């Protein structure tokens, strides 16, 4: 098992998570005893204990006082915070994960975009006005796109959408920089922003879902053209 890590705790965490992912520690199984596991990984028991607590908080493990540590089925017990980890563990499946991420984001954003234009059209107009000074670079578009989503999610009347977006943030920012490196993708997005601005000015929230659906289809087609050339390094958490 080849693991790139910045220190003993990082190594131990990646070792255990990869072992769970590769079914060496399958869901429902009991982890080896602390002393045995610390010797196996090559870290102190204190370091291991801290790592186990962190993995339990993320849903990978179940720790109960006086009982052995049990491996969870992370698909049932973890949240969006493990998206980065899954991308790291499964680079071959990363393009599919991104497809699923973008699909989920498109579906959810249709709800909070509509909510924002309905409940806070002035805030929507304010953030959309920034498109007229937007630099034609991948970095600027990726940053603005996240800002737009974050602002409208917060203005939708349901701030829980912001927490969902936060779970996507690291992964989406890397994918976004790659996606918006295409001038066609930037133009497609700019046209969408302009149409959304017109709806905001007209306080027309009813037509938002149709606009989102059209942009979702068109940007999805654009993504399919780009994804096969996506650098594998984008899957890595430290990629910039």
Swiss-Prot record:
GO biological process annotation, one example: fatty acid metabolic process
UniProt KW Transcription regulation keyword: yes
Segments forming domain HTH gntR-type: 6-74
Subcellular location(s) of the protein: Cytoplasm
DNA-binding region location: 34-53
GO cellular component, one term: cytoplasm
Domain of life (superkingdom): Bacteria
Subunit structure of this chain's protein: Homodimer.
Role noted for this protein: Multifunctional regulator of fatty acid metabolism.
Protein name per Swiss-Prot or TrEMBL: Fatty acid metabolism regulator protein
Native species: Shewanella oneidensis (strain ATCC 700550 / JCM 31522 / CIP 106686 / LMG 19005 / NCIMB 14063 / MR-1)
């Amino acid at each position: 098992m080849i693991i790139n890590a910045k220190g003993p705790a990082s190594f131990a965490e990646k070792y255990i998570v990869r072992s769970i992912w590769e079914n060496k520690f399958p869901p429902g199984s009991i982890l080896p005893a602390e002393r045995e596991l610390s010797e196996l990984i090559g870290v102190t028991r204190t370091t291991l204990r801290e790592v186990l607590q962190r993995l339990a908080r993320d849903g990978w493990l179940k720790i109960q006082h006086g009982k052995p540590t049990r491996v969870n089925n992370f698909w049932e017990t973890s949240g969006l915070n493990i998206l980065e980890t899954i991308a790291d563990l499964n680079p071959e499946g990363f393009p599919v994960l991104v497809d699923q991420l973008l699909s989920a984001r498109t579906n959810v954003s249709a709800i909070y975009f509509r909510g924002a234009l309905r409940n806070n059209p002035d805030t929507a107009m304010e953030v959309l006005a920034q498109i007229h000074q937007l630099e034609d670079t991948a970095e600027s578009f990726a940053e603005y796109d996240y800002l737009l989503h974050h602002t409208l999610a917060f203005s939708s009347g349901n701030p829980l959408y912001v927490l969902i977006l936060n779970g996507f943030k690291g992964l989406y920012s890397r994918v976004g920089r790659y996606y918006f490196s295409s001038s066609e993708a930037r133009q497609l997005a700019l046209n969408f922003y302009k149409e959304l601005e017109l709806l905001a000015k007209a306080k027309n929230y009813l037509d938002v879902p149709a606009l989102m659906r059209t942009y979702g289809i068109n940007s999805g087609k654009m993504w399919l053209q780009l994804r096969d050339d996506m650098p594998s390094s984008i899957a890595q958490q430290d990629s910039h």
